[in-house]
């Protein structure tokens, strides 16, 4: 539920930023506003994937030698 809310918030922010870009004809500050949010989501996702991989390897070796 939290992921869906944050994704819709990011989409709204992207749309409003693009609207401001059309008015001001500038694109430099758009990336400053958008990138940190996606970078944080990407970092959390990568950490979760690495954690699941490590956990699965540990469980595999624990249960494979029975």
From Swiss-Prot:
Ranges annotated as spanning the membrane: 44-64
Subcellular location: Host nucleus membrane
Membrane topology: Single-pass membrane protein
UniProt main location, coarse: host cell
Gene Ontology annotations for the cellular component aspect, listed alphabetically: host cell nuclear membrane; membrane
Residues modified by glycosylation: 7, 24
Assigned keywords, A-Z: Early protein, Glycoprotein, Host membrane, Host nucleus, Membrane, Transmembrane, Transmembrane helix
Protein name: Early E3 7.7 kDa protein
